[in-house]
Amino acid sequence: MAIYLDKLKMPIIIGLIVLIIASLTGYYYYTHNTKTSEIIIFAAGSLKIPLDEIASKYSEKYGVNIYIEASGSVEAIRKVTDLGREADIIAVADYRLIPTFLVPNYTSWYIGFATNQVVLVYTDKSKYHEILENNPSEWYKILMRNDVKWGFSDPNKDPCGYRSVGIIGLASIYYNDTSILENLLLNKTNIAVEKVNDTLNLIVPADLKVSENSNLIIRSKSVDLISLVEAGTIDYAFEYQSVAVQHHLKYIKLPDQINLGNPKYAYFYGKVIVKILVGTDKEKSIAMSPIIYGITVLDNAPHRSEALKFLKFLLGNTGREIFEEKGQPYLDEFIVYGKIPEELRSIAGSES
């Protein structure tokens, strides 16, 4: 009887073994063959909304999973350079960060593709917004009021942050009023200033601090300030115009001479240099210039082929339409550096 039962069990055991092997083989096949059907993107926070929409359309069309991790642009880059994390695409709010931090060790090429400008966002709950709406040139005087809370993002982590610092420096030159710099930056933070010939250098320590009881609020990335403005926790924040449009916030435009959105004033913008991460081996000097977003695929991208296909899709008509709608229009001609991969040359052109 025992022998008979053992004979019955044997086919069952063999069947289970076959099933387990088949399952493991299937899992191995799935994990190894779906690995190329995903893309990992580290992106600037201000790119999150248009990238999400483009990724959704691409995924729907090609069945590819796209993971977008948003942060400040400098922080996005340091995830790769300092933390050793894997990514396929890096998309930043200042294309110059790519040659500064990533070329030549992580990539040999990049594309500058979209523009923006910095504005001051607010709501109907913001103190003195009626004055601002009637007299936009009073913006810096309103920010100087002790009962007004305002903010910008961390210049050591986010381009909108160092651009906000630079804009305050440019405003002090444009309005010929040194009190702007003193009251909005120097008296509220440990940021320092030095004048070198006609250039204003604003020095941002790596351990940036805000004075106690200050009405200035700093957050890691510019989009982190949106919820504070919407809730009335702060009255005003420096943001990209695209962020204001995407979040349906009121905003006032700053003069073209200081908003970093008009290439005509590139020379004037360059009168201010912001030094970030001062006191570390990562210290960089960033001259103010017109805002241009940049993008690249890393040399060691784990899903390089798929990432290049997605980038071609992004730089094409679909991407152009979405970015235009979100307030970040594409350049008439892309800025191209390095030997662009063959897959992109028909749409991005050659090195300029």
Swiss-Prot record:
Residues spanning the signal sequence: 1-22
Gene3D superfamilies: Periplasmic binding protein-like II (3.40.190.10)
NCBIfam families: PRK04168.1, tungstate_WtpA
A Pfam family reported for this protein in Swiss-Prot or TrEMBL: SBP_bac_11
Name under which the protein is recorded: Uncharacterized solute-binding protein Smar_0280
TM helices/strands, residue ranges: none
Disulfide pattern: none
Keywords annotated in UniProt: Signal
Keyword Glycoprotein: no
Sample GO molecular function, one term: molybdate ion binding
The keyword Signal is annotated on this UniProt entry: yes
A Gene Ontology biological process term: molybdate ion transport
Stated family: Belongs to the bacterial solute-binding protein 1 family. WtpA subfamily.
Superkingdom of origin: Archaea
